[in-house]
Amino acid sequence: STYNSYANSLFRDNALALGYEPEAALLTDSSAYQLAKKVVLNFGNELGVQLDEVDLTLKTAIDGVLKLAAELNDNLATGEDVAAVIAELKRQIAAVPTKKEKLAATHADFFAGAFKTEVLVLLAEQYRREKLLQGYVDYSDQVALAERAVREIDSLRDTERELHKIVLLDEYQDTSYLQTSFLRALYADHPVFAVGDPNQSIYGWRGASATNLNEYVETFSTDKAKPVTQLKLSTSWR
């Protein structure tokens, strides 16, 4: 099965323990857009901020919410994490002298962009809450919620490791940080065999990174004294 389909099956088997319904509907792109639009229009008004005040149109706000919500999942981050980073950057930037006019303009651009991101973070978090309230999940939710299930349900890891004595991972260069975190939570220090080609990584647009290959040993082996076999296939037989 694909990484997402495997994660989805684990999520649905344990959905009730996470506060979700096992039959949670998978959002289509069009349904996700409509839900994000509803959040921007309704919750945006509650924030008391006009879109044009943060240099956003309705479409760019919706696109930004969807993109940011997915990125929060893909990086196992929260809106609070992003807000903390922005606050620290603002503190550091504010401490830089602005004697020169060009630098002052750069400061202004940064703070305008930071304010826009802060607004989008609030909207993205509300979008995530709305998905839960309405019984929806999307593709990134499948893996994020499965990873959460592994962390929160003690028996799940042991059950899966007993079921899968040996784990084979294909196209490993196309795994994302989220997928890798999920697989590590389940199978670190378990017999895992992965195949990947850094020259064929094609899913960078959704968070995949060929650097996962370089970090494979550190990801799945915590026992530094135990050797990990690595083989290089220099000839393609396709």
Q: Can you annotate each of these PLM segments?
A:
Residues 1-67, 211-215, 219:
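Conserved P-loop NTPase-based nucleic-acid remodeling module centered on helicase motor cores
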Residues 12, 41, 132, 151-152, ...:
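Residues at helix-coil transition
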Residues 177-238:
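Conserved RecA-like helicase ATPase core segment
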